[in-house]
Amino acid sequence: MASAATTTHFPSSRIPSEPCASSGPLFPDDVLFTTEASSASSSSCHVENDSRPLSPTMFTDGRTPVNISAKHLKDHPLHEPTGTSEVLTFYPTMREFKNFSQYIKKIEQNGGHLKAGIAKIVAPEGWTPRPTRKDFSDVDDYEITQPARETIEATEKPGAYFKRNVTCRRKMPVREFRTLANSAQYRNPRPDLKGSEIEKHYFDNILHGEPIYGADTEGSFYDAQVEEWNMNRLGTILEDTNYEIKGVNTVYLYFGMYKTTFPWHAEDMDLYSINFLHFGAPKYWFAISSEHADRFERFMSQQFSYQNEYAPQCKAFLRHKTYLVTPELLRQAGIPYATMVQRPNEFIITFPRGYHMGFNLGYNLAESTNFASQRWIDYGKDAVLCDCNKDSVKIDMTHFMAKYRPDEYTTWWTYWYGGGRELWIPKKKKEVPKKRRQSLADASKIAKRARLGASSTATDSDGSSGSSGSEEATEGSSFMRALPAGYTVHNWQLRPDYDELLRKYKKETKLLRSDTRIDFYQEREFNHARRAEWPHCAVCQYFQPPHMNAINHTVPNSSRRLIPKWCFSKTDTKKHEDHHEPPPPLDRLLTCSNCHVTVHSHCCSGGGGGGGDDDDVTSSGEPWRCPRCRNRTDVEIRTTSCQLCELRGGALIPCQIGTDSTWAHVACALFNRRAIFDCPNRPGACFVEPSPRQQSETPRMPPRRLSEEYRAELGDLYENSRWECVVCHRTDEGLAPCVLCIEEQATTSLPTLAHVTCARRVGFVCEVRDYPRGVVMICHKHEHSYLVNKTTQQQAYTNVKVGDFVFVEDVVEPPQKLFTRGAIVRADKKETVVVDFLDNSCSRDNHVEDIISCECLFCENGDHQYGARVKVVWDDKQVYDAYFRGKGQMIEYTVRLEDGREVRHPRNRLKTKRELNAYLKK
């Protein structure tokens, strides 16, 4: 079998998208490499300082043979994978081995970081880090600093364990440690075991014994003159830090004995790490790729939430290195993991945010440190850090961002360090005097009786109209009158009480958070309660403002959809359609027989039985189930949660992000600008493009791709970086930005960002806009911002008064503009309404009577509910859909033109002579 140096290069059409796992070794012809590499001679592939990241290398997934000498293979036997994924093992030549950073690039170009979060590198045959010495006899004279006795405790959750360390000595000579490690009390009782037998024996006896670990001892056993992979000078960008961080940019030694354990963790600041085993018994590793890191963190938080003693209180609790779970629990949760055995003269590389744990199989010595590449910067810039331990590692990323990410630097620094991150604290609730409370309660009852009179008439369908009660009591509430009998108004505020909703948020979501113990009963109760709210669909409800709740506990067979089809397709399907399309049709409502979630058949049927127009049962006669509950085990159903937010409940569909097969709320996928649905009509799954820092792709993406116009409409900062949700304070990618913040704030400031599920809980409104904006979220900061903007707009104009001469734009054929001179004869204060149109424009000078209909649950005298859908007559006499923002005031000027006509206009439609000259010069 040919070695890497004599590999024949094949056309790129044969190159797979990921490393091949078929029979035979994985050679360069199985992986992608550059045109230059393909045309170069085989000898040029091994230049000492080769700058090409994809030059040949040899690796295996453990199931395929490798072309190395028999002696080398005996010293470094292949590890047959025992997990659900594989760790790739690489075999560099001596020439490749000379350039550390370049070889790490090769590993990542070959997908080594995606398989399991770690990779093994077997040092070239004959290489040693100590060429001046033949043995390690000098190690006995070394002193271990603060060796720790390990105790592992069982938790209430079977298969979940907690590790404690107690320093047993201030110092211990290695000679004494070696004697202890090889004694009958501490040595490995079954060194003959292989593969999964090693794992089983370890976890079966995990609670027995208290081994001593000589970890985190400063020092190195490399010869100073060794250049290759010398941990004291790896030459990566981490050396740009101008201060020493013990064990991070310095080297630590690890003296192990059987069963000494390093629990699940990712490296400090999500750095890379390198671990080299000098001598002794192997290390046994478990690893999880960064593609599954979010899901793994959520899973671990769930497992340890059953007992207060072990429940995580820190957002970065896994950095404590105290939590362990069995492989069986990972299998049950569907989290891919891999295993690897590390032997002497072998390196293990861990990648940014790659989780790993392991244990030693006997007395051994390893050394380790951290390093970085430019790819790491995108992890380190928003790494979630431990704040409960004063000794936790923190690296100032300012230098790295300024030097390597100059385009992002200002926005990043302003957000994290310059006061740009919003800390929303609800205002203290004021105590209302008892007499005042009574008068408010009486007024509330009177108003409520008037409103409920509007819903006392039965109708045949959700969209038909009826009338009842006095005209005064139902003024402006035609939408409420149109609802069938049985609806009551539980929340009728003109504007959401954001602070009150935020105060309730933590209590109401405590049992629905996806990082706490699983409680499927609470999810069902939540879904059952939510389905009573009009329009009853768990997806469309996001587009009905939460302060406008109409409740009917008898769910109808159908209701109106609030989300147009193009929002699911995320394409410009309206380009050639009539702007004034008819109202969305009624759509059949389906309720899952298992989790009780209710959805429109076109919002989330998943293509299963019951998605048709005539039945809500499967072809076999079974009651309809949602995609989450369909053809899945009880364990799978209960452990399902959304990958794009932090809350349980609601309509979930399968979601593929890179190679991670997970789940997402339909609503979360609607707002995520990297997500695309498998089908815009009755979506059953979604696919999300992974962050560029992952260097991966999502397989099986639909051929219909997201356009650059859509993806770039709000920028890519929110999708490609992790920011903090203003509501739950969790740090995630893909948070929904407030669209009004984007329009009103400085370019260096980030808008309010939130998970859409959190946003609706605290009163933020979700609305539909024309392509390419799509669905948008509006935060709490804009409840009265239209008044501020109005004042600012008025100040931009010169004051005019009765008697002044002005110029008015007259009506002519576009694009011509004709300005007619006239005199102001009257100025009247007028009440106006502020509305946002679907084309993203905002009008601030419409008259109250320009709104001809609304979907408020109750309104009077032109006071509509904030965020209500309204229909507005524009100057062209056409009717347009819009969202109500508020009421204001303007001065309307009556101008008598020179031809005798009188016209009425607001100030922004008039120009003084100076303003006209400036306009014409443009």
Curated annotation (Swiss-Prot):
It is found in: Nucleus. The keyword Cell inner membrane does not apply. GO terms for cellular component: chromatin; nucleus. PROSITE patterns: EPHD, JMJC, JMJN. One of its GO terms (molecular function) is histone H3K36me2/H3K36me3 demethylase activity. A zinc finger (C2HC pre-PHD-type) spans 639-675. Its main location: nucleus. Residues 87-130 form the JmjN domain. This is Lysine-specific demethylase 4. It comes from Caenorhabditis elegans. The gene is jmjd-2.
